[in-house]
């Protein structure tokens, strides 16, 4: 709740600053004289910006299960020893992290895992068969610790709120620019014309791309923190380092020589700005130098 409150206050503060800046520069007076209500537009933009993000968060668990075909393990009747071990491991990690025990699921796919859910005490941790088949139990436990750390850190809520903030500004700025082009450049004086709608569409695309870079940057910072969280829950950084090395195709114990290789959702060059995960080598290097407490 504190995290949500702080982000909402931050969003409100930024909106107020933006509104005040426009008033000082005279943009507010010009647009208002032309029939545009900035206060109303800010409220409209916030509603649009946050509604989609919050709905996505609330639907994240069922959507994740549906999209991956994940099968939730019955905590009272695991089908085999591996499922029993998974349940026990996730529950132990959750207890150490001080959160409610998540649902645990398995899905068919390449080595990967994820955590989702709107609440710390009502989340889902899922792991792929590919990851279970390619890692040792200690490495799998480290990956599970990484996902539990995401839940404990409130990363799903944090990124949802960040997405809501940037969505708000994408919607708001696109319409301000569209109104300016329509009235000041195209000299349309009756309602809004095609120039307004065309400009809004183009601006939403451009601003949306820029906004995704911001969200991706925040996501990468949360990945570093979740790696450190796994090391803390495991009592050692080595299991997570070995798990990352295996995910990146490195030999266990091999030290990275550069930061050029891709991460789990590997990207290079300009596309790296849009990646939700840092490069594997960067994560290993950060974990090796992280202060664990």
From Swiss-Prot:
Positions of transmembrane segments: 4-24, 38-58, 161-181, 198-218
Pfam families with a match to the protein in the record: Peptidase_M48
Cellular component, GO, one term: plasma membrane
GO molecular function, one term: metalloendopeptidase activity
Residues at the active site: 147
One record GO biological process: proteolysis
Keywords in alphabetical order: Cell inner membrane, Cell membrane, Hydrolase, Membrane, Metal-binding, Metalloprotease, Protease, Transmembrane, Transmembrane helix, Zinc
Cofactor stoichiometry and binding remark: Binds 1 zinc ion per subunit.
Main subcellular localisation: membrane
Cofactor(s), names only, from the UniProt record: Zn(2+)
Membrane topology: Multi-pass membrane protein
HAMAP family referenced in this protein's UniProt entry, alphabetically: Pept_M48_protease_HtpX
Protein name per UniProt: Protease HtpX homolog
Gene source species: Bordetella pertussis (strain Tohama I / ATCC BAA-589 / NCTC 13251)
């Amino acid at each position: 709740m504190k995290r949500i409150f702080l982000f909402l206050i931050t969003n409100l503060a930024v909106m107020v600053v933006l509104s005040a800046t426009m008033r000082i520069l005279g943009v507010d007076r010009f647009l208002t004289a032309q029939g545009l209500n900035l206060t109303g537009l800010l409220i409209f933009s916030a509603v649009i910006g946050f509604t989609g993000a919050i709905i996505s968060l609330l639907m994240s668990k069922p959507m994740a299960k549906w999209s991956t075909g994940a099968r939730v393990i019955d905590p009272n009747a695991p089908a085999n020893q591996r499922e029993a071990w998974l349940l026990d491991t996730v529950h132990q990690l959750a207890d150490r992290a001080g959160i409610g025990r998540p649902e645990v699921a398995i899905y068919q796919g390449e080595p990967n895992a994820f955590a989702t859910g709107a609440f710390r005490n009502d989340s889902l941790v899922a792991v792929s068969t590919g990851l279970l088949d390619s890692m040792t139990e200690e490495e799998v436990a480290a990956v599970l610790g990484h996902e539990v750390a995401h839940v404990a850190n409130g990363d799903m809520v944090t990124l949802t709120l960040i997405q809501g903030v940037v969505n708000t500004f994408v919607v708001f700025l696109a319409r301000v620019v569209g109104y300016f082009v329509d009235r000041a450049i195209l000299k349309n004086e009756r309602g809004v014309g095609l120039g307004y709608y065309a400009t809004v569409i183009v601006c939403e695309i451009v601003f949306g791309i820029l906004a995704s870079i911001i969200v991706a940057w925040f996501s990468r910072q949360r990945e570093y923190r979740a790696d450190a969280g796994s090391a803390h829950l495991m009592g050692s950084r080595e299991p997570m380092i070995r798990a990352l090395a295996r995910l990146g195709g490195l030999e266990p114990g091999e030290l990275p020589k550069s930061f050029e290789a891709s991460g789990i959702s590997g990207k290079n060059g300009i596309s790296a700005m849009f990646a939700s995960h840092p490069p594997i080598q960067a994560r290993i290097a950060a974990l090796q130098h992280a202060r664990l407490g």
